[in-house]
């Protein structure tokens, strides 16, 4: 996951992360959407979510996740921003539900 540059947006994103932390083992932030998505594709990461990146930030990673058999979707945040997220197919539904419960997507 990554965070926006606007401080008010970061505070909202931080609240989502705070809700997620007790429900996952760890959160890792590599700093590149495409590299995070490659981690999902290779199985070293269980999921990826980020609010507001541009298509050029994640497009290559999306192709790699889908080629590896994973699932990638773009949801919407409560603020109306795009929220790309991905996970292995067998885990995607549960991951997406968790993202909704934690306020990442509506």
Regions found by a protein language model. Give the residues of each.
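An extended, acidic
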Residues: 1-106
């Amino acid at each position: 996951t990554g965070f926006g540059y606007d401080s008010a947006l970061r505070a909202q994103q931080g609240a989502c992360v705070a809700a997620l932390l007790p429900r996952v083992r760890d959160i890792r932030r590599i700093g590149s959407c495409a590299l995070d998505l490659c981690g999902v594709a290779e199985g070293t990461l269980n999921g990826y979510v980020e609010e507001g990146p541009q298509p050029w930030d994640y497009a290559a990673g999306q192709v790699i996740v889908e080629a590896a058999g994973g699932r990638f979707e773009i949801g919407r945040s409560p603020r109306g921003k795009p929220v790309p997220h991905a996970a292995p197919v067998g885990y995607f539904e549960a991951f997406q539900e968790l993202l909704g419960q934690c306020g990442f997507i509506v």
